[in-house]
């Protein structure tokens, strides 16, 4: 428990290994690879609590998270720490210290207003911006279309769950020699978003990767039509890399399970009020 509280209050990070050789690429647009236990067993424990929250009416979610949904300023904090003075989201001709893509639903918790759902059997979709592997789209590689000689490539990942995000990180670990994942204090600890910071590009591998992508998309520039789910590797990445990734993501999901459990207990407390011991613990933890 002390470790969970420490991660929430101080943040957590991991440095991923560099691989000189790209994995065999096979880009296919339109569908994400399905989740499996191999890519994070903790998720399947954590998703049970997410489903509990997913069944709650959104007006109640807004009420109980109003004071703990602080503005997500983690990207700004990263810019400050790395002394990044200028960023760009697109445009090869634009000069900047970093090229950035934010795939997260910044400062949002749910997708649309909704009433309560009776039971998990009636859940047909994930209405929360939490643990939704379908949120990872091919936009995660968009910065590479506009990368020239920027010092950093920075991605705000919408989720840490599923094969897609691990395959993506494995590719980035051949495109850049320094790849770090961060879950900052100033990110939302209600959601499983995180930041990837990559630097020291491996030009040879980047050229190989972009050649494959451009041959599949039949375009040398980014097209918005490519902003869809995708799969990119036929074969699973090596177990060593998966475990290194899970070393980081498990810390995040353990913290989220604790936070979500407090929130659910608060929303279902006998007091029938936002003034209850679970909510007080939650506020103390996150504020």
Swiss-Prot record:
It comes from the Viruses. Belongs to the chordopoxvirinae mRNA-capping enzyme regulatory subunit family. It holds the Pfam family Pox_mRNA-cap. GO terms for cellular component: virion component. InterPro entries: Poxvirus_mRNA-cap_ssu (IPR005009), Poxvirus_mRNA-cap_ssu_sf (IPR043096). One of its GO terms (molecular function) is mRNA 5'-cap (guanine-N7-)-methyltransferase activity. Signal peptide: none annotated. The keyword Transcription applies. GO terms for biological process: DNA-templated transcription termination. Its main location: virion. It is found in: Virion. Heterodimer of a catalytic and a regulatory subunit. Intrinsic methyltransferase activity of the catalytic subunit is weak and needs to be stimulated 30- to 50-fold by the regulatory subunit, which is itself catalytically inert. Keywords: mRNA capping, mRNA processing, Transcription, Transcription regulation, Transcription termination, Virion. This is mRNA-capping enzyme regulatory subunit. Regulatory subunit of the mRNA cap enzyme which stabilizes the catalytic subunit and enhances its methyltransferase activity through an allosteric mechanism. Heterodimeric mRNA capping enzyme catalyzes the linkage of a N7-methyl-guanosine moiety to the first transcribed nucleotide (cap 0 structure), whereas the polymerase associated VP39 is responsible for a second methylation at the 2'-O position of the ribose (cap 1 structure). The lineage of its organism: Viruses, Varidnaviria, Bamfordvirae, Nucleocytoviricota, Pokkesviricetes.
